[in-house]
Amino acid sequence: MVFKTIWIERYRKLINLFRALASCHGSNLDVEKPVVFKEDAASFGQTVVQFGGSRLVVGAPLEAVAVNQTGQLYDCAPATGVCQPILLHIPLEAVNMSLGLSLVADTNNSQLLACGPTAQRACAKNMYAKGSCLLLGSSLQFIQAIPATMPECPGQEMDIAFLIDGSGSIDQSDFTQMKDFVKALMGQLASTSTSFSLMQYSNILKTHFTFTEFKSSLSPQSLVDAIVQLQGLTYTASGIQKVVKELFHSKNGARKSAKKILIVITDGQKFRDPLEYRHVIPEAEKAGIIRYAIGVGDAFREPTALQELNTIGSAPSQDHVFKVGNFVALRSIQRQIQEKIFAIEGTESRSSSSFQHEMSQEGFSSALSMDGPVLGAVGSFSWSGGAFLYPSNMRSTFINMSQENEDMRDAYLGYSTALAFWKGVHSLILGAPRHQHTGKVVIFTQESRHWRPKSEVRGTQIGSYFGASLCSVDMDRDGSTDLVLIGVPHYYEHTRGGQVSVCPMPGVRSRWHCGTTLHGEQGHPWGRFGAALTVLGDVNGDSLADVAIGAPGEEENRGAVYIFHGASRQDIAPSPSQRVTGSQLFLRLQYFGQSLSGGQDLTQDGLVDLAVGAQGHVLLLRSLPLLKVGISIRFAPSEVAKTVYQCWGRTPTVLEAGEATVCLTVRKGSPDLLGDVQSSVRYDLALDPGRLISRAIFDETKNCTLTRRKTLGLGDHCETMKLLLPDCVEDAVTPIILRLNLSLAGDSAPSRNLRPVLAVGSQDHVTASFPFEKNCKQELLCEGNLGVSFNFSGLQVLEVGSSPELTVTVTVWNEGEDSYGTLIKFYYPAELSYRRVTRAQQPHPYPLRLACEAEPTGQESLRSSSCSINHPIFREGAKATFMITFDVSYKAFLGDRLLLRASASSENNKPETSKTAFQLELPVKYTVYTVISRQEDSTKHFNFSSSHGERQKEAEHRYRVNNLSPLTLAISVNFWVPILLNGVAVWDVTLRSPAQGVSCVSQREPPQHSDLLTQIQGRSVLDCAIADCLHLRCDIPSLGTLDELDFILKGNLSFGWISQTLQKKVLLLSEAEITFNTSVYSQLPGQEAFLRAQVSTMLEEYVVYEPVFLMVFSSVGGLLLLALITVALYKLGFFKRQYKEMLDLPSADPDPAGQADSNHETPPHLTS
C-alpha cells in the first residue's frame, strides 16, 4: 500500500512537470483544473453541445428513462459542476428514440435540436426506424417535435386476384357465403395502394372485374354482388393459367411494381380439366405471384386432395394453404389471411421496390439552418441516405443524390451534416462514409427551390469512413465559410489511425479538392483520429480560428484531443499545438474525445472553452489568457570606441565597452475578464552566440551569458547591464551580437487558476547589434591602399611530371587606412589545383590569419582561389607574407609558359590600381621517360676462317623504343653503324623501321681517329671511333603513351677488314640514341642512361689444319708408344708364369689344427 501511494505521488509530480513544460511551450488549454461533469447514466457524454453561453447540454442516448423510452438530456452548469436531467415531453409514438444521439444548437443560441434517430413504429409485424427530433428553446423548453407526427405505416402496392370455384358441386347458399367472404377480405385489405380483380371458374372461365374496372368502380362491393354462379365442372388449373396470363397483365390494370397475390377458393379436386398443375404452377412462379389456397369441405381429408391443395398454394404450405369444414367457417380465417398478406409488406421480391423512408433514421445527424432544421436520414432508399429539411410550414423537403442512383446504394448519405455560407449562397454539406466503400462528401445548393448537388470530394481508402464527421470553419470570422474539415476516423496506417482532410470551399466552376491532411500522434493505429471535430475559436491570438479534433481510440481507448491552429484563411497548420490525453486528466477515463463542442465562454472569464465528451464524463477545458511581450535592446554608446578595442602592441586589459538596456513590454494578447495578470518571466542573454570565443562579457557574470527571472505585471519593464571587452578584438567589422531568449510561465490569476501563455506574434527572442567604431578619417568610409606581389620561390623552370607541386611566395601590404574584408584572388590554368597555404616564418606586429579556398570561375580553362587576409580587418601599415601551394597534374599541358595572376581587393570599394594586380610567367617543360634498349635476339657471335675463304655473313642488330611517359611526344632515333675500315667494307647494313609515320635519313661520317692500330690495341672494338660509319636518323612525330617501336639493322657482315686490326677477336659495335626537343621536354631525372643503347657482335677467327698428315703422324706415334710400353713390361717380368712356383713353396700359414690334412689331394689340373 505504501509503495502504491509513493508511485501515485511520483506520477502526479511527473504529470505536473509535463504540464509546466507544456505551458512553457505555448499550450492554449488549461489541463490542470478542468471542470468535470460525471453521471452514471448509460452513454453519458456521447454527445455534448455548448448552449446559451452558460450551459452544457449533454446527451445520454442509451439511458433507459421509461418503458419504450430511451435517451436523456442533461443540463450541466460550469459554475457548479452539477448536471440536471432535462424534463421533456416525449411523443408517445417516439418509441425507444435514443434521444441525444445527435445534438446541435443554432449560431445565436436561441434553439437547440436534440434527435433520436432510432424512434420506431410498428406496422403490422414490421418495425420501422423513422427517427424523431425535439426542438428546444433558449431555456431548454419544449417547442415542437420534428417531424410533428410519426408518418403512417407505408402502404405496399398490391394487386390481389380472387379465383373462386363456381362448379355445380357448390350449393347456392355456400356460393353466397363465399361471396360474402370475398367482400369482407377486400374490406380488410383495402387501401389506396391495393387493387382487386376476380375470376370465376367451372368448365367455363369468366372474368367478373379486372384491376382497371375495380379502380374505376364507385362501389367495389357491388362488383362482387353481381356475380352469378356458373355451374359445371371444375377446371382449377385452367383457371389459374387464365388469371396469370390475363388478369395479371398491364392491359387489365396490373402494376409492374405491385406485389401479385392470387387467392384460390375451391371445394375439391379439379375434374376433367385438360391442364395439369405441373404446366400451370411454374408459370405463376415465374410471374412472381404469391398464391393462397383455401379448401372448403370434407374433400380435403383425402391425401390426394390435400396434395393438390398444397400444389396450388405457394411454399411453404403452412403459410399459404388454409382448410375449413364449410363455407360458413371462412370467416374464421379472415384475420389469418389478412396477417399473412400484411406480413409480406416491406419485403422485397424480384418485382417489388426497395425501402424508401421506412428505415430512414431521421436525425442521425442534424443541423439548424436558416430555412429550418435539417435531419440526416441515412437509411432512406435502402441506406442510400439523404436529409430532410423542415421549413416553418413543416412541409419537408427530401435532399439526396437521386432516388434511383444505384451508385449511392448503402452510401449512408446524411451520416454527418454541416452548413456553409460561401459567396452569398447557403449550402448544405452531407457526408456519405460508405459510398463505394471509400466514402464521399457532397455540397448541396438550392436552385429554383430544389436542392441539387454542386460539388463533391471522395475518399481513397476502403473502409476509412471518409465523411463520418464534418466541420465547416470560418477562419477569419467574416461570416463566410472558408474551409471544411472532413473526418476519416478509420483511415489506417501502420502506426496511426484516422486523419482529417482540410478542404477549402470550391470555386464557382472549379472542382472541390482537399489540401492539407491532419494526423494524430504516431503509435496509435486504432486511434480514430477525426471521430469528432469542432471549431474552438481563436485561442492563440492570431485572429484565425483554431480547431479541436478528437481521437477517442488512442492509448487503448483512453482517448486524446488535439488542438490545431489556423495557418491562413484557406489552411490549418499541419502540426498540432497541443495534445491533451484522457490519461493526463484521469487515469481511468475512457473514450476521451468522442464528442466535442467549442467556441463559447461558459466560465464567464472572457475566454472560449472546449467541452470534451468521454464515457460517463464531460470535461470543460478552459483556454488560457494570452500575453504579448515586446522586446527592445539599446546600447550606450552606440559604438565600441577604437580606444577600447584596438590594443595591439600593449598589454591587454579588461575595458568597459558600454551598456545594454533591455526593455520588456507586457500586454494582453486577447480580451478577457481577468484584470491585471502577473507572469513569471525568464530571459537568457548571450553575447556573440555561435562564436567559439565571445568578444564581450557581462560585468555581472564575467562571462558571455546572463539569466534573469522576474515576476512582471502588465506594462514596461527595463534593466541596464554593463558590457566589458576582456581582450584585444581581432574582428572589429562584425558587430557584437546580443541575443535574448524569453520564456513565460504565467502565474495563476486570482480566483480563476489560469496561467497566461504567450500569444502568437509575441517576441520570444530578439537579436541586437553593438557595432565597432571604424578607424577611418572619413566616417563610414576607409581608404585602404593595398599591394600584392609574388615569386616562384626560386624555381626557374616548372617541369611537369617531376614537380608535383608549385609553391608561390606572396607578399601583401596595406599602405592606407584599415582594409576591410581583404581578399587576394589567384587566377591560374585549370591543370593546377589549390593545395594549401602556409605562413612565412617572419615576425608580424599583428597575428596573421589566412583562409584560402578554391572558387569557380565559369571558365573551363581557368581556375581561381581566394585568400582572406586577417579577416575582417587588414590593419593600416600591415604586411603579410605567405606561401600558397598548387598541385600540378602529371598530365597537365600548360604550353611553354605558365601565367599566374593575383589581385588584391577589399570591401572599402577602392578602385583597382597597378599595385593591386600582379602577374608573372614561369617557363614550363614536360618530363618524359623514353627508353631505347637492345633486343636479345640480335646477332651476338660469329666464327670465321680466312684460309677457307669465308668473306661475309648476315648479321642483325635489333633495338626497341618505349614511351613510358604520360605524354605523346615527338622524338628522333639515331643509329651509328661501322661500314668501312680504311676503304674495306665492314657491313652492308640497311635499317628496317616501323612503317607508319616514321621517316629515316642517312649520312656517312668519317672516323674520329685515323691511327687504327693505336686505338684498337687493348680494346679490340670496331666502332665509329676508328671506322667510317653510317648515321641513320628516324623522326617519329607522335609517339603515344606506352607505345613501342622496333628497329632492325640488318646486312652482310664482311671479314676482310679484320686482318688490318692484327686481332683474332674483334667486337663490332653499333649505337643508338633517342633525341627530342630539350626546350620542351626533359628526361626524368636519373633516367638519362636509358636514352642510349649499344648492340655488339663478337667476330673470332679460327685456323684449319690438314687431316691426312694428322692421321699418319698419329698412327706412327701410337705404334712407337705401344712398343715402348711392351718392352718396359717385359723387363719387369710381366709376361712370366709364377703360379706353379708358388704352389711348390711350403705354406706360410700352418694348419689351424696343428697338422696338415693327410688326405689332401692336388687338383688334377694343377699337376705337372
UniProtKB/Swiss-Prot annotation:
So where does Ca(2+) 2 get bound?
Answer: 538, 540, 542, 546
Gene3D superfamilies, per database record: Bicelle-embedded integrin alpha(iib) transmembrane segment (1.20.5.930), Integrin alpha, N-terminal (2.130.10.130), Integrin domains. Chain A, domain 2 (2.60.40.1460), ntegrin, alpha v. Chain A, domain 3 (2.60.40.1510), ntegrin, alpha v. Chain A, domain 4 (2.60.40.1530), von Willebrand factor, type A domain (3.40.50.410)
Q: Which residues are exposed on the Extracellular face of the membrane?
A: 27-1107
Q: Which residues are glycosylated?
A: 68, 96, 108, 400, 703, 741, 791, 943, 1052, 1077
Q: Where does Ca(2+) 3 bind?
A: 601, 605, 609
Localization (cell): Membrane
Q: Where are the bilayer-spanning segments?
A: 1108-1128
**VWFA domain boundaries:** 159-341
One GO term of the cellular component aspect? integrin complex
Which membrane topology term applies here?
Single-pass type I membrane protein
Give GO terms for biological process.
activated T cell proliferation; cell adhesion; integrin-mediated signaling pathway
Q: Where is the signal peptide?
A: 1-26
Which positions does the entry assign to FG-GAP repeats?
28-85, 86-145, 348-399, 400-451, 452-512, 515-573, 578-638
Q: Which Pfam families match?
A: FG-GAP (PF01839), Integrin_A_Ig_1 (PF08441), Integrin_A_Ig_2 (PF20805), Integrin_alpha (PF00357), ITGAX-like_Ig_3 (PF21520), VWA (PF00092)
| Description of its domains | The integrin I-domain (insert) is a VWFA domain. Integrins with I-domains do not undergo protease cleavage.
Role this protein plays: Integrin alpha-D/beta-2 is a receptor for ICAM3 and VCAM1. May play a role in the atherosclerotic process such as clearing lipoproteins from plaques and in phagocytosis of blood-borne pathogens, particulate matter, and senescent erythrocytes from the blood.
The family classification in the record reads: Belongs to the integrin alpha chain family.
Q: What PANTHER family does the database record attribute to this sequence?
A: INTEGRIN ALPHA, INTEGRIN ALPHA-D
Recorded protein name is: Integrin alpha-D
The species is Mus musculus (Mouse)
- Per the record, the gene is Itgad
